[in-house]
Amino acid sequence: MDDIFTQCREGNAVAVRLWLDNTENDLNQGDDHGFSPLHWACREGRSAVVEMLIMRGARINVMNRGDDTPLHLAASHGHRDIVQKLLQYKADINAVNEHGNVPLHYACFWGQDQVAEDLVANGALVSICNKYGEMPMDKAKAPLRELLRERAEKMGQNLNRIPYKDTFWKGTTRTRPRNGTLNKHSGIDFKQLNFLAKLNENHSGELWKGRWQGNDIVVKVLKVRDWSTRKSRDFNEECPRLRIFSHPNVLPVLGACQSPPAPHPTLITHWMPYGSLYNVLHEGTNFVVDQSQAVKFALDMARGMAFLHTLEPLIPRHALNSRSVMIDEDMTARISMADVKFSFQCPGRMYAPAWVAPEALQKKPEDTNRRSADMWSFAVLLWELVTREVPFADLSNMEIGMKVALEGRPTIPPGISPHVCKLMKICMNEDPAKRPKFDMIVPILEKMQDK
């Protein structure tokens, strides 16, 4: 089978769908030129493939090596329907590439008149200059130039030249495709790992920042008592299910090994510059989480959990809380698979009871509806996002477990958005059977995001 980039170029929708259904495939990877699958589908005008990639979570504003976004390529080649689709999903209409050109520069240069009109109607600036001092209108033939000038004036644009600045891109979420080879290495040679700095140490092990094959990574070295052949076998059998590359809101385990001389099981995952959601909310990062960003994080988490809940069987021993949600460089929240517990790791112990559903504290795991319990955890995360507080911060884990089991609940303070407040209460229904499923709350959060 040809690679995914060829399938996207050729518009082979069936092959692309089969490739996307494999959880070990990363739809945001790049080829040797930094083109993502979405870049190629937009360049070649493959509308069905573009739709499929966007629906599965392809990054809209991803850049290739020349800083072109998919919108640059669709505009250059006159694929009007794809341009409109990208704009519908909030593509950056004035994104600049390495030459300082925005998509409108290319639509004008290549005579894509309808695309140019659509771009201006949606806010593309007609007088923004590239590195060479040229505006998009300078690239257009006379009739189109006059039409765009007239349209821009009607929309209230200032037609004075806007000089090029290196900072045009700041404040936008620009990312590059990920290394497409990382998902090919399930088994990793411990000797290839370069440990740079210890980030944390707790009951479950050590967390390190490291480098592997030229990539920044996080290395998690697990603490396990009485390591045995059976535990080694369980580790090797359970790891592959954590290599989920196919969803943008799930952070996969890249690979695993057992480190010498003492066999410490070791997991490797992507480096996340902002750390966890807990770090962002409670540990004084420079990241500002306003109402809009809080809803975005909630939507990201709901989408990730909706996907995980489609897996059969469910990933066992996964606990949803703000320490197990990581924040990517483009401010995307991702459910971390490296935080899933293995069968040999302290069965029965609860390390974050503040986020655990009361029935999960009172019953055995096999007697608990995991999907409903996860929805309770999500409700606590909503509370955390809007209050910026740690739930039950003044209590010990044992006290928290007792309190939640005995109907102690986080208090919803006044001033919270009524929409968020209502959603929180629905998700935290005392009757697990009455809590919604994640695929039911995703559309609600999408509407809240659009307001």
Swiss-Prot record:
ATP binds at N200, N202, H203, S204, H270, M272, N279, K341. Residues 180-212 are annotated as: PH-like. Phosphorylation by PAK1 modulates ILK subcellular location by promoting its nuclear export. Transmembrane segments: none annotated. The keyword Disulfide bond does not apply. The kinase domain is likely to have lost catalytic activity but retains ATP-binding activity. ATP structurally stabilizes the kinase domain and promotes stability of binding to PARVA as well as focal adhesion stability. The PH-like region is not required for assembly of the IPP complex or for localization of ILK to focal adhesions. One of its GO terms (biological process) is cell-matrix adhesion. Its main location: other. This is Scaffold protein ILK. It comes from Cavia porcellus (Guinea pig). Mg(2+) binds at D339. Pfam families: Ank_2 (PF12796), PK_Tyr_Ser-Thr (PF07714). The modification Phosphothreonine is found at T173. One of its GO terms (molecular function) is protein kinase activity. Residues 33-139 are annotated as: Interaction with LIMS1. The modification N-acetylmethionine is found at M1. Keywords: Acetylation, ANK repeat, ATP-binding, Cell junction, Cell membrane, Cell projection, Cytoplasm, Cytoskeleton, Magnesium, Membrane, Metal-binding, Nucleotide-binding, Nucleus, Phosphoprotein, Repeat. The modification Phosphoserine is found at S186, S246. GO terms for cellular component: cell cortex; centrosome; chromatin; cytoplasm; focal adhesion; lamellipodium; nucleus; plasma membrane.
